[in-house]
């Protein structure tokens, strides 16, 4: 009997996580989709005719993650691949950011990868086989303005995965840091915005949709999965991410000053600290036209 390899995707119900799940399924894996929203999981799973299971899981709940991993191991067999994609995007000036925004970002995008990795590692080490992938971001290499909680968490995720990869060398288990730039996944409407929420949503959604600076999410997901399965320690997606790595390493001071200059062109703080979801904001006809490709991606990737 042919053994079907199992892949766990944390944050696999929508957006980039769903794109990664599709690529793993294409490679012949049974895909265990994990996310908090059961309805979103059911919608995502409906496009797969076989080799799929859904698991309600919150990556911030350590015991819950361990319980789901045990459920997958007992029900479907050894987990060969585990990729952490779950995330939250909070956009707004630092003056309007509250400490709880950092807590939310760190719990999901810094502690989440640790919870997933520490739950799958024992069985992977025992078999001396397995691949762990963590989706970080170019925001974990260069900290752009108005994304401070997000970048703080992504820097932490990148440091964790880089160190884990070094310690796993020679064990048969690999860890891959995935560093994408902007991608057209449709996630801008799932992001939350503080300060001048409409103005923040406008610049962010247009940037995430622009073909010249954002990547096609399907092609990006394919490269990510290929890199994780190959056991590469680092996979950079998009020229922007590649350039950020090199420029930040060679000229850190200049990079920070460049970010400071770009901050001058972004909306000012207003004192509004209450996050507003992007999908709740009205947008102008011009912005709708400029975000056409991202809205198409949102429909395809269950970003509803």
Where in this protein do the model-derived segments appear?
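Substrate-binding pocket helix/loop in short-chain dehydrogenase/reductase
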Residues: 93-94, 101-106
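Conserved glycine-rich cofactor-binding loop
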Residues: 13-14
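SDR active-site lid
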Residues: 170-241, 256-257
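Conserved glycine-rich Rossmann-like NAD(P)H-binding loop of the short-chain dehydrogenase/reductase
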Residues: 27-43
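Residue(s) in the substrate-gating loop at a strand-loop-helix junction
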Residues: 137
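The beta1-alpha1 cofactor-binding region of Rossmann-like NAD(H)/NADP(H)-dependent oxidoreductases
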Residues: 56-67, 99
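Active-site helix of classical SDR
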Residues: 117, 153
């Amino acid at each position: 009997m042919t053994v079907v390899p199992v892949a766990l995707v944390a944050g696999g119900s929508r957006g980039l996580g769903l794109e990664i799940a599709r690529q793993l399924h294409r490679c012949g894996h049974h895909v265990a989709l994990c996310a908090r929203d059961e309805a979103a999981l059911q919608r995502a799973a409906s496009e797969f005719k076989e080799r799929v299971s859904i698991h309600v899981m919150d990556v911030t709940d350590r015991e819950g993650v361990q319980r789901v991993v045990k459920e997958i191991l007992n029900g479907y067999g050894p987990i060969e691949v585990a990729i952490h994609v779950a995330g939250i995007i909070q956009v707004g000036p630092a003056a309007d950011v509250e400490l709880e925004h950092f807590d939310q970002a760190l719990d999901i995008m810094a502690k989440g990868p640790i919870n997933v990795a520490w739950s799958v590692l024992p069985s992977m080490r025992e078999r001396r086989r397995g691949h762990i992938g963590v989706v970080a971001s170019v925001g974990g290499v260069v900290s752009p303005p108005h994304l401070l909680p997000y970048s703080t968490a992504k820097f932490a995720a990148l440091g964790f995965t880089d160190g884990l990869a070094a310690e796993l060398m020679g064990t048969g288990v690999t860890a891959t840091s995935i560093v994408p730039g902007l991608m057209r996944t449709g996630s801008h409407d799932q992001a939350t915005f503080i300060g001048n929420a409409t103005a923040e949503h406008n610049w962010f959604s247009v940037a995430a949709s622009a073909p010249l600076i954002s990547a096609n999410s399907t092609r990006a997901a394919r490269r990510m999965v290929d890199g994780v399965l190959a056991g590469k320690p680092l996979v950079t997606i998009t020229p922007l991410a590649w350039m950020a790595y090199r420029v930040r390493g060679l000229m850190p001071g200049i990079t920070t000053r460049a970010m400071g200059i770009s901050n001058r062109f972004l909306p000012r703080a207003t004192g509004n600290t209450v996050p507003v979801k992007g999908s709740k904001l009205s947008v102008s006809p011009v912005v709708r036209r400029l975000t056409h490709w991202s809205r198409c991606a949102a429909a395809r990737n269950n970003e509803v």
